[in-house]
Amino acid sequence: DLGLMDIKNGDLPEKVKRNTKTRRARVNKRILGRSIDERSPRIESRKDFGHWECDLVLGHKTKDDDVLLTLCERKTRQFFMIKIEDKTSASVMKAFDKLREYYGSKWNQIFKSITTDNGSEFADLSDLEQVSKTIVYYAHPYTSCDKGSVERHNGLIRRY
């Protein structure tokens, strides 16, 4: 826009699809569990394996559309997509129960922490802390950049 580079807006697919809108003040939702502010600096530095970001990708928002539970490991950027029935906390927990069953005794080494947003579909996720050593952190409300790796992958899924 400033004309500093020889690039047009049409060359930037992310910029073209975003509409600039006036900002509105939002009333923040309450954080469901442990805040992302309590996360260790070691997790922030991406030095250790086993710290995951989690989100949902919805289809075209019709009643029968597919929903994907996406998980991205912070250090290696390893990425999982799990198709779930719907956008409910019961479906999300069922997917995590299947993952726990699949990994068995290795679960605690692979999933040390999970960072997710404050959506109602993740309300029961803190129950994982009771049945395993996995710590669940909730991002700040309306701040998707708190879990940027998984959001980047989700953008690629939506594009293709």
Tell me the role of every PLM-derived stretch.
Residues F49-H60:
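Two-metal-ion RNase H-like nuclease active-site motif
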Residues D55, L71, R77, F96, ...:
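Mobile genetic element proteins and their domesticated derivatives, centered on retroelements
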Residues E44, V57, K63-F80, F96:
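Short conserved beta-strand segments at catalytic cores or DNA/RNA-binding microdomains
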Residues V131-S132:
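Short, structured coil segments at secondary-structure junctions
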Residues T88, K106-W107, F111-S113, N118, ...:
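Conserved, well-structured core segments that form or line functional sites
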Residues H60, D64, M81-K106:
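Active-site beta-loop-alpha junctions of metal-dependent nucleic acid enzymes
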Residues D1-S45:
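Basic, flexible linker segments flanking DNA-binding modules
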Residues T116-G119, A123-S126, Y138-Y160:
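RNase H-like two-metal-ion nuclease catalytic core shared by retroviral integrases
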